[in-house]
A protein has these predicted regions:
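Basic, helix-initiating cap at the start of DNA-binding domains
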Residues: 1-46, 50-62, 76
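C-terminal peripheral helix-coil segments that are non-catalytic and often amphipathic
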Residues: 1-19, 152-156, 160, 192-222
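Short amphipathic alpha-helical segment with a characteristic S/N-K-E followed by hydrophobic residues
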Residues: 35, 73-79, 88
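Short hydrophobic/aromatic patch on the recognition helix
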Residues: 61-71
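Hydrophobic alpha-helical connector segments
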Residues: 80, 91-120, 173-176
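Short secondary-structure transition hinges
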Residues: 115-162
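Hydrophobic alpha-helical bundle segments that form small-molecule/ligand-binding pockets
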Residues: 144-172, 176-179, 183, 187
Length: 222
């Protein structure tokens, strides 16, 4: 076989291999996304511990081996799903913060999405997350970031005249965070509706932080 013919043959073979590799890569990428979506939906509906890896594989019509090739453990699957959720949520919050005219409009937008989110999620999902160390560490990091974001949000509210400027917001955040943890640890969401919890925890707290202008705006929301 002539030398150049061999070169052309090898080039064609290489292109075919590269195309096959790309197709496999695209397939795995799409499958990874489908696994995350299916698993997180099941976790939110039934609770994390109630959903087995076998259940996820069966729902997608794939083998357990294929599932474990992409996610070695259930914790890795959950961890990536949680990270994806937080990335999307942060992107949404950034857009809302930029698009809303004032902090009160931001509160309304976030309130609506959070209430809808809690309605669609089995409370056991939140209770189960602490059982997974990687997820718990990530959530702790996110809580620290939320702390920083909240302080900036309050500064904006002070500037706009909706929040009081004589409040220790660092302390207020610590107290609010402690109340939120109390709700979760004692599973108050099993006794009260999400609307009741938000009304009595979030809005009562916010009312104490508002100026007269802020209280009037808050009353329109509630």
């Amino acid at each position: 076989m002539p030398f150049f013919t061999i070169i052309l043959y090898l080039c064609r073979q290489n292109r075919m291999i590269m195309q096959e590799s790309k197709e496999i890569s695209d397939y795995k990428k799409n499958l990874r996304g489908s696994i995350l979506e299916t698993a997180m939906h099941a976790f939110a509906k039934k609770g994390i511990r109630a959903v087995k890896m076998d259940d996820v594989a069966a729902a997608l019509g794939i083998s357990k081996r294929t599932l474990y090739e992409i996610f070695e453990t259930k914790e890795l699957l959950l961890s990536e799903g949680i990270r994806k959720y937080y990335a999307e949520r942060q992107d949404y919050y950034r857009r809302v913060t930029q698009q809303c005219k004032n902090v009160m409009e931001v509160l309304v937008a976030i309130y609506r999405i959070k209430v809808d989110e809690f309605r669609k999620t089995n409370p056991q999902f939140y209770a189960d997350m602490d059982k997974y160390p990687k997820v718990a560490r990530f959530l702790n990091q996110q809580n620290q970031q939320t702390h920083k974001d909240m302080l900036k949000f309050m500064e904006r509210g002070i500037y706009e005249g909706y929040f009081r400027d004589d409040v220790n917001y660092e302390l207020a955040w610590l107290l609010f965070d402690a109340l939120g943890k109390y709700v979760m640890v004692n599973q108050l969401y099993r006794q009260y509706t999400i609307e009741e919890i938000f009304q009595n925890l979030v809005f009562v707290t916010m009312r104490g932080l508002c100026t007269e202008k802020g209280v009037k705006a808050l009353d329109k929301i509630v």
